[in-house]
Amino acid sequence: MGADRGRGGRRRPARVVAYAVGGVVLLAGCAAMPDSGDLRGVESTPRQDPQVRVFAMPPREDAPPADIVQGFLEALTSDDPHYETARKYLTGDAAKSWRPDESATVLAGGPGTESDHSGNREDANDYSVTLTGTRVATVDAQQSYAPADGVYRESVHLTRDGKSKQWRIDSLPPGVVMGKSDFQRNYMSVNRYYFASNTPVRAAAETGPVREPAAVADPVYVRRRVDPMTQVVRSLLSGPTSLLGPVVRSSFPTGTALAKNAGSLAPDDRSKLTVPLNDKAARAGADKCDEMAAQLLFTLQNLTPAVQEVELRSGGEQLCSLSEDRAETVATRGSAQRPDYLYFVDDQDRLVRIAAGSNGTRAEPVPGPLGEGHQALRSVAVSRDEHSAAGIGLDNKLLYVGSLVSGGSLGDPVLASQGKTESDRLTPPSWDAQGDLWIADRNPADPRLLLLKEGAGDPVEVRTPGLDGRVQAVRVAADGVRIALVVEKDGKRSLLIGRIERDGKAGDVPAVTVLELRSATPELEEVTAMSWAGDARLVVVGRERGGVQQIGYVQVDGSTPEASVPAALTGVKEIAATEDERLPLVAYSEDLIVRLPSGLQWQKVTEGTAPVYPG
């Protein structure tokens, strides 16, 4: 810690001195405190060891202003729960008004320091320093991450106390600031779960219209080693981020919070977590309580597999209890839905399939007209219940929808593009969890994002205020409230993530809008292909400016998840994944369908194109 400082800044080596006091190890400067083993100095590199906690020491007596600033920056990256050590570098008034949880600014190489030599004299009573760096990201008060760029320059002012003669900071930027590697070591991303407010998921069962609420992942960043389980529960109860707020709901009654005596939360030896709540939670009925427990269980299992059951209590009485087996009957998550088949177009231009997750290499035509070969196909999409499929003809001009049941006929195309060339016509389609079909028409004279209700009828033009560019690819998330678009502008293809809002009553023609489109890959100049690969994660094929094509994962907020990078593969034109992360990636490369089983290298499946999982 502390090595992540700007090169132009003044750098003093951290002092690492250990004192044993009543069995407690105190470290001067910054150091790591393992639960067992030897003390060691702290390097500013990503560390995944959950047993290591880092603490800073307060300012030493008569420390000069530069050391006070340096020590404060060091303390910001420690595991001090309430930043009490960092506050000791501030004046009394500044310590009271400083809100470290207000924001976090992440810099590429850490903050450098520039002294204001024109006005600084250590023999005077005030001193100014400018923190400098290059912005990478910000985390706001809701713990929501967003990529950022540009120059960072913020002033820090110090004053010398008239009585103690000690230098302290009396004016500083809001929140905390640190380098990227310190941020990766100190913070972790966790998906909180809420429910789509107006988009229940169509049940996979063939009988009955039962619809379950769709669970929606809302990623936030929490401090990795500062009681993350309790942090995450408090964060979930505080409500969704503003980006998702208009389209999700929480089942917790307004005002629900942890009970005052809740303390630190941890599961028992039976993997059950008991969550004591205040009296507001007692107003929920049995069904709502199950939904509350499901929100907690989905969220906590994203943090750790150690939680397999959640019990909610209020006023000393049990409200409800929910196990992971029963949680899937309360709400549906994309990551919990395992598709039956992988689909692609074979060398006879038919829609074919192979059992998902199998080692098989022999595909079979799907039942129904799209598997019979009467209509040659260029690209396809299969509904999430695997009962219907959509296909684009070879010239990208016509869209067909057919049943995956033997004996059916294909019928007329449901959509036609008037674009003059193949690249100016229809994109591959995508099905949402409600059974509706999405597609973009790339016709330069009339570019549109379209929705076909249940894959039929007149297409509804989706409003896209603020969209600057032409849509080249469409993928709707399993939760039904997020959409991923590859958008081309001025020769650059970017991945944008937006929020889907639907207006209108059941049975009416919906008014559909995609809002708050944000770049998830600002560093990539060319996005070739993408697919959803988790509740809040995508796999992306692309390249940086002047670089070579690569495959990687990205979170919906634009951050990089803690996941292994897929093995390299050249010439990738299409890629398929599923929200169930246990299933292999599948790609179209060099005229072949290939797959990547977990921990292995890419393997040839067979000849073909356009691989897709349902969705």
From Swiss-Prot:
UniProt-annotated stretches for the region Disordered: 100-123
Annotated keywords: Cell membrane, Lipoprotein, Membrane, Palmitate, Signal
Cellular localisation: Cell membrane
Lipidation (N-palmitoyl cysteine): 30
Signal sequence segment: 1-29
Lipid modification (S-diacylglycerol cysteine), residues: 30
Membrane disposition: Lipid-anchor
Chief location category: membrane
The UniProt record lists the keyword Secreted: no
GO cellular component: plasma membrane
InterPro entries per the UniProt record, alphabetical: GerMN, Lipoprotein_LpqB, Lipoprotein_LpqB_C, Quino_amine_DH_bsu
Extent of Basic and acidic residues compositional bias: 114-123
HAMAP family: LpqB_lipoprot
Family: Belongs to the LpqB lipoprotein family.
UniProt protein name: Lipoprotein LpqB
Species, as recorded: Streptomyces coelicolor (strain ATCC BAA-471 / A3(2) / M145)
Gene label: lpqB
